[in-house]
């Protein structure tokens, strides 16, 4: 495990000792090397976990998320270059240090073996994200967004700490590998209802569950590009990862408690998809589409069948790459037109044909076109939900239609139509941006050929 943690820590002195001309080259190249070494984690067997030490372990659930985390740092650095070109050298270095520390915390969160360590690192990811949003965001509303983000996350996760201390006192251990064998069945009593809520609420706020999702569009819209990318791609997946890990302790209580949350998610999935159709702001649309995709994951995790677990993990990875790519595309529009309003960016296909190709690919993966892994994840979730209750197929079908509608609406609004007069003098697409998009879409296309490596521990 240290072969990922120590190089990540050494990125910080590398950044601070680099000259102004070399700072982006050094940090991006080194982080790309780290992300390529992370591919070695694919080399493990499906049914056992790699116990690195008494502190860290990884199994086939955390491995894809780990690789996604490490893959994202060079992409965030590539995407932020234009955004930071006006800043002075110290601020650039500070920004890169924030991204590196965020990656460090995330790697340790996904591999932590003790639940308390997991909780501490889960909270630690809040700090760099908050600094990135409130310091480098675009508008002054970023402070409001940061406050929402901070208080939703903190209020959600304080009960989790109390619940973990209670579990530590009753069971005697918070080790993931021990808990599988030591855990007592949780029967339904009032105290256990509150324990279940305390354990799940932190992750449901993070996912986010419909109704607790208000911080997400604000944070996404106000964050700089790197903040949006890491928030959509990895920080939302922390909620899903935590839920998959902690449902182990809460059986058979989940069978009784899951109903209202499944209903809320199925309803919220349709509602947020419909909200997407009425958005004028490009980033806000992508943020709401994230809520609707994550609602599927919540439903899948709460149903607790092997198929739904596989669907949830596949959908999390697919959505991480897709939404990150969409945010990059929205940012490349924003850098040229200086506005996130979709109406002001019409007809870009005639000016930037290669960018239009990336937009098409990203929109199609977002609406879960076969044979992408987005579709594989969604199909697994839909089938397992259908076998749980037949009536859900109506809601799922409506959701798929609306998802296709808003994805194509986003594509048509930005690419087609007669272009407005103020975009006659925009710059062409850079090699940096094309490399960035291809590094997002290549993993998606390659995973299409071999999706079993992201289907989680139950495959």
Swiss-Prot record:
UniProt-listed Enzyme Commission number(s): 7.1.1.2
Keyword Membrane on entry: yes
Family membership: Belongs to the complex I subunit 4 family.
Main location per the UniProt record: mitochondrion
UniProt-listed GO biological process terms: electron transport coupled proton transport; mitochondrial electron transport, NADH to ubiquinone; mitochondrial respiratory chain complex I assembly
Keyword Transport tagged: yes
Catalytic activity: a ubiquinone + NADH + 5 H(+)(in) = a ubiquinol + NAD(+) + 4 H(+)(out)
Source organism: Bos indicus
Job of this protein: Core subunit of the mitochondrial membrane respiratory chain NADH dehydrogenase (Complex I) which catalyzes electron transfer from NADH through the respiratory chain, using ubiquinone as an electron acceptor. Essential for the catalytic activity and assembly of complex I.
GO cellular component, one term: mitochondrial inner membrane
Stored InterPro entries: NADH4_N, NADH_Q_OxRdtase_chainM/4, NADH_UbQ_OxRdtase, ND/Mrp_TM
Subunit structure of this chain's protein: Core subunit of respiratory chain NADH dehydrogenase (Complex I) which is composed of 45 different subunits.
Segments traversing the membrane: 22-42, 60-80, 94-112, 116-138, 147-167, 196-216, 224-244, 256-276, 284-303, 308-330, 351-371, 393-413, 435-455
Database matches in PANTHER family: NADH-UBIQUINONE OXIDOREDUCTASE CHAIN 4
Organism classification: Eukaryota, Metazoa, Chordata, Craniata, Vertebrata
The protein's name: NADH-ubiquinone oxidoreductase chain 4
């Amino acid at each position: 495990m240290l072969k990922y943690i120590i190089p990540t820590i050494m990125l910080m002195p590398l950044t601070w000792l680099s000259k102004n001309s070399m700072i982006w080259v050094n940090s991006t190249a080194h982080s790309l090397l780290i992300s390529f070494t992370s591919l070695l984690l694919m080399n493990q067997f499906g049914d056992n976990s790699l116990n690195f030490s008494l502190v860290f372990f990884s199994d086939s659930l955390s491995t894809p998320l780990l690789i996604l985390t490490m893959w994202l740092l060079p992409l965030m650095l590539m995407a932020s270059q234009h955004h930071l070109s006006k800043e002075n050298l110290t601020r650039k270095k500070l920004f890169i240090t924030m991204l590196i520390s965020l990656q460090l915390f995330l790697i340790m969160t996904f591999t932590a073996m003790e639940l308390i360590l997991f909780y501490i690192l889960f909270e630690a990811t809040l700090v760099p994200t908050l600094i990135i949003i409130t310091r480098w965001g675009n508008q002054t509303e970023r402070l409001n967004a940061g406050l929402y983000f901070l208080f939703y996350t903190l209020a959600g996760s304080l009960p989790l700490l109390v619940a973990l201390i209670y579990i530590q006192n009753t069971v005697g251990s918070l080790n993931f590998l021990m808990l599988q064998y030591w855990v007592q069945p949780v029967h339904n009593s009032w105290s256990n209802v509150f324990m279940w809520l305390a354990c799940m609420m932190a992750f449901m706020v993070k996912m986010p569950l419909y109704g607790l999702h208000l911080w997400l569009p604000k944070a996404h819209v106000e964050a700089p590009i790197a903040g949006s990318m890491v928030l959509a791609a990895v920080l939302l997946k922390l909620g899903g990862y935590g839920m998959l890990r902690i449902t182990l302790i809460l059986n058979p209580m989940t069978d009784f408690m899951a109903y209202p949350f499944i209903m809320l998610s199925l309803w919220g999935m349709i509602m947020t998809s419909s909200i997407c159709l009425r958005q004028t702001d490009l980033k806000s649309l992508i943020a709401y589409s994230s809520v609707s995709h994550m609602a599927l994951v919540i439903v899948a995790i709460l149903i607790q069948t092997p198929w739904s677990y596989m669907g949830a993990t596949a959908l999390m990875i697919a959505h991480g790459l897709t939404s990150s790519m969409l945010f990059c595309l929205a940012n490349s529009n924003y850098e040229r037109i200086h506005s996130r309003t979709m109406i002001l960016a019409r007809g870009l296909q005639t000016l930037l044909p290669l960018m239009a190709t990336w937009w098409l690919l990203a929109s199609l993966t977002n609406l879960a076109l076969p044979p992408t892994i987005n579709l594989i994840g969604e199909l697994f979730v839909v089938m397992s939900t259908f076998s749980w209750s037949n009536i859900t197929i109506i809601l799922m079908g409506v959701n798929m239609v609306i998802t296709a509608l808003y994805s194509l609406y986003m594509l048509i609004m930005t690419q087609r139509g007669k272009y407005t007069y103020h975009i006659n003098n925009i710059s062409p697409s850079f090699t940096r941006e094309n490399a960035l998009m291809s590094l997002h879409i290549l993993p998606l296309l390659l995973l299409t050929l071999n999706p079993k490596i992201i289907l989680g521990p139950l495959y």
